[in-house]
Amino acid sequence: MTHMLNAAADRVKWTRSSAAKRAACLVAAAYALKTLYPIIGKRLKQSGHGKKKAAAYPAAENTEILHCTETICEKPSPGVNADFFKQLLELRKILFPKLVTTETGWLCLHSVALISRTFLSIYVAGLDGKIVKSIVEKKPRTFIIKLIKWLMIAIPATFVNSAIRYLECKLALAFRTRLVDHAYETYFTNQTYYKVINMDGRLANPDQSLTEDIMMFSQSVAHLYSNLTKPILDVMLTSYTLIQTATSRGASPIGPTLLAGLVVYATAKVLKACSPKFGKLVAEEAHRKGYLRYVHSRIIANVEEIAFYRGHKVEMKQLQKSYKALADQMNLILSKRLWYIMIEQFLMKYVWSSSGLIMVAIPIITATGFADGEDGQKQVMVSERTEAFTTARNLLASGADAIERIMSSYKEVTELAGYTARVYNMFWVFDEVKRGIYKRTAVIQESESHSKNGAKVELPLSDTLAIKGKVIDVDHGIICENVPIITPAGEVVASRLNFKVEEGMHLLITGPNGCGKSSLFRILSGLWPVYEGVLYKPPPQHMFYIPQRPYMSLGSLRDQVIYPDSVDDMHDKGYTDQDLERILHNVHLYHIVQREGGWDAVMDWKDVLSGGEKQRMGMARMFYHKPKYALLDECTSAVSIDVEGKIFQAAKGAGISLLSITHRPSLWKYHTHLLQFDGEGGWRFEQLDTAIRLTLSEEKQKLESQLAGIPKMQQRLNELCKILGEDSVLKTIKNEDETS
């Protein structure tokens, strides 16, 4: 090898060191070409194959749904692309709503700590070189002084290291707090929390997005800022220091710089080619975690029904299936990380270490600024080269570690892309639902030539059912003018309702199951949109809805009566505990005050109170809020008839207009008008004559009881005819009627 370098140098008139540097560059270039060529060729083949596949199946990219004016496409998987940066910039507006914020303060402190750590690293690298030089020169006094300096600098260095971790956690917590505050404000505005589940189908598990997704996104952003800012600064400062050191010693930094750039570039290309789609994998993992949590919460919410049916085996299989899907996804991620980290460690630990030794050796070997050639200065020469080598090695190790963290961060960036897509999608859905834009998910079947599996796409209701109706708040009366009842799925339950309920009127609403009775209450409460017509109704504070199963909130007994008011709201309205006691007397519920330990008793009220007590608590809330209109949806079905009648009479006496859904004839006398649905889209609104309706009801029950025995009598008659071998007169008449 030496003869070859000498011959090449003599022919082109290069120095031996110049020939060695050029030879090293050529070897590195050849190695990089050998490494990158198969990867690039593979990528080009995949790209060409993808284009051919796209040309062969042009209809697979876009899927059109019948009755939809908009072409709907499947969502692209999250990745580091233009969409990712666009979503991140949109979320930045939430994280930093203005220039001077708490988050900005923590970010500045974190940046100062990162910059301080970089300068400390450079200073420690130089100090290490001086310590090694003092050892080589056999100067114990100098060694002790330098060692003391090294120990003294360790105090601020360790503090800065601890501060970096502390500030990173504080920054992540500040980001999470900002996102949670904004999410909660949007989630509880305009009843979005209801509509995002019942009217929209894009978010399967909002609780997952509001908790874990926001947490993981905040931690990932803060960690990436730390893992990218400091390494980039380290690379810049260490490179500048190394170049300055090499130049001051008379060595050329071009060769090592080119080698470093080539190695880093080759490593980046290899890692990018080998990197799995971590963004898509992490997003799918988060989705499966959310579904597993949903299955658990579903069991908890229906635990009594499952126990009655003894359905524990079915539910256990569902849980096991959901957990297995999550475990399979986690195993897939772990297996892909195994091979990716192996390749990453090989390139960054061993390939970079060998390249680093070459980069450090070349400037020191070729440098002319050391005292060389004189016998009296041999010791100085050795110590200076040792110091330069140690300092350069430490600086290079610091720079290599920084580049390694930058390149390793690509995997974390792809994971951040998954969290960013989920959090951004959550805010996007919340905003659209708040503005009355709903989209539901439909499953369509592709043609057999493309796929045998159904593709899930989003069907915007706004394309099929435009919301053209108007809702106008008025002080008096409820008026429906051509208002249809349409479910979130787009089914028309009743068409063009027209009725008017004035103050002092009491409306009874009847009809078979699924005819639209409760749906009408959802429209009046603003939960469902008015697709056509005009709805005049009082403001929400003048209407109060009581369901069949009232919600029991967390808190004291007092909180149950005044829900959703707080104690301060109660005092502002002028209520006292004595007033609440009178309300409980009205609904025959005062005994629970003594039974449960007073107004300040805190319990899990949904388990403490019986079904009838919970329904009476719902009626107590009505007397507390004193609305103009009360929407009663089978709210006293578990209350005895005598107590139920007293409550309704007290409500009428309090001046509350009742809109009641009930099947009990005993309550008809408390109403003045009737809205009856026929279950086929028809309806009628009329004044209620209780006496006539009760008479008709009694006649209906009498006929039902008489006709109930006819099938048994007919069966017995047939048996007697067979035994006697005779025909029945009724059969003869029936046959004659059929013949004629």
UniProtKB/Swiss-Prot annotation:
InterPro entries assigned: AAA+_ATPase (IPR003593), ABC1_TM_dom (IPR011527), ABC1_TM_sf (IPR036640), ABC_transporter-like_ATP-bd (IPR003439), ABC_transporter-like_CS (IPR017871), ABC_transporter_sub-D (IPR050835), P-loop_NTPase (IPR027417)
Record keyword Ligase present: no
A single GO cellular-component term on record: peroxisomal membrane
SUPFAM superfamilies according to UniProt: ABC transporter transmembrane region, P-loop containing nucleoside triphosphate hydrolases
Residues annotated as binding ATP: G511, P512, N513, G514, C515, G516, K517, S518
Domain ABC transporter: residue ranges: 478-704
PROSITE patterns membership: ABC_TM1F, ABC_TRANSPORTER_1, ABC_TRANSPORTER_2
GO biological process: alpha-linolenic acid metabolic process; fatty acid beta-oxidation; fatty acid derivative biosynthetic process; linoleic acid metabolic process; long-chain fatty acid biosynthetic process; long-chain fatty acid import into peroxisome; myelin maintenance; negative regulation of cytokine production involved in inflammatory response
GO terms for MF: ABC-type transporter activity; amide transmembrane transporter activity; ATP binding; ATP hydrolysis activity; ATPase-coupled transmembrane transporter activity; fatty acyl-CoA hydrolase activity; long-chain fatty acid transmembrane transporter activity; nucleobase-containing compound transmembrane transporter activity
EC identifiers of the protein: 3.1.2.-, 7.6.2.-
Annotated TM spans: 107-127, 144-164, 251-271, 351-371
Major subcellular site: membrane
Catalytic activity entry: a very long-chain fatty acyl-CoA + H2O = a very long-chain fatty acid + CoA + H(+); a very long-chain fatty acid(in) + ATP + H2O = a very long-chain fatty acid(out) + ADP + phosphate + H(+)
Matches recorded under SMART domains: AAA (SM00382)
Glycan attachment sites: N190, N227
Keyword field: ATP-binding, Glycoprotein, Hydrolase, Membrane, Nucleotide-binding, Peroxisome, Translocase, Transmembrane, Transmembrane helix, Transport
Keyword RNA-binding part of the UniProt annotation: no
Tissue specificity note: Predominantly expressed in brain and heart.
Chain positions covered by the region annotation Interaction with PEX19: 1-218
Topology class, membrane: Multi-pass membrane protein
ABC transmembrane type-1 domain span: 107-399
Compartments it resides in: Peroxisome membrane
Subunit structure: Homodimers. Homotetramers. The minimal functional unit is a homodimer but the major oligomeric form in peroxisomal membrane is a homotetramer. Forms heterodimers with ABCD1. Forms heterodimers with ABCD3. In addition to tetramers, some larger molecular assemblies are also found but represented only a minor fraction. Interacts with PEX19; facilitates ABCD2 insertion into the peroxisome membrane.
Function noted in UniProt: ATP-dependent transporter of the ATP-binding cassette (ABC) family involved in the transport of very long chain fatty acid (VLCFA)-CoA from the cytosol to the peroxisome lumen. Like ABCD1 seems to have fatty acyl-CoA thioesterase (ACOT) and ATPase activities, according to this model, VLCFA-CoA as free VLCFA is transpoted in an ATP-dependent manner into peroxisomes after the hydrolysis of VLCFA-CoA mediated by the ACOT activity of ABCD2.
Family statement drawn from the similarity comment of this UniProt entry: Belongs to the ABC transporter superfamily. ABCD family. Peroxisomal fatty acyl CoA transporter (TC 3.A.1.203) subfamily.
Protein name as catalogued: ATP-binding cassette sub-family D member 2
Organism: Homo sapiens (Human)
